[in-house]
């Protein structure tokens, strides 16, 4: 099994911009971000 970890900026994950930079990494199921 291969696991892939992909980091997406907070902006594309609908968390916010620089003011939400303190949010810890999290796991989300399904498509998140652009495209």
Swiss-Prot record:
The keyword Oxidoreductase applies. GO terms for molecular function: glycine reductase activity. It is an enzyme of class 1 (oxidoreductase). Its EC number is 1.21.4.2. It catalyses: acetyl phosphate + [thioredoxin]-disulfide + NH4(+) + H2O = [thioredoxin]-dithiol + glycine + phosphate + H(+). Transmembrane segments: none annotated. Keywords: Oxidoreductase, Selenocysteine. InterPro entries: Various_sel_PB (IPR010187). In the first step of glycine reductase, the substrate is bound to component PB via a Schiff base intermediate. Then the PB-activated substrate is nucleophilically attacked by the selenol anion of component PA to transform it to a carboxymethylated selenoether and the respective amine. By action of component PC, acetyl phosphate is formed, leaving component PA in its oxidized state. Finally component PA becomes reduced by the thioredoxin system to start a new catalytic cycle of reductive deamination. Heterohexamer of two alpha, two beta and two gamma subunits. Component of the glycine reductase complex, together with components A and C. PB is substrate specific. Belongs to the GrdB/GrdF/GrdH family. This is Glycine reductase complex component B subunit gamma. It comes from Gottschalkia purinilytica.
């Amino acid at each position: 099994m291969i696991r892939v970890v992909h980091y997406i900026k907070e902006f594309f994950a609908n968390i916010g911009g620089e003011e939400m930079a303190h949010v810890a990494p999290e796991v989300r199921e399904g498509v998140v971000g652009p495209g």
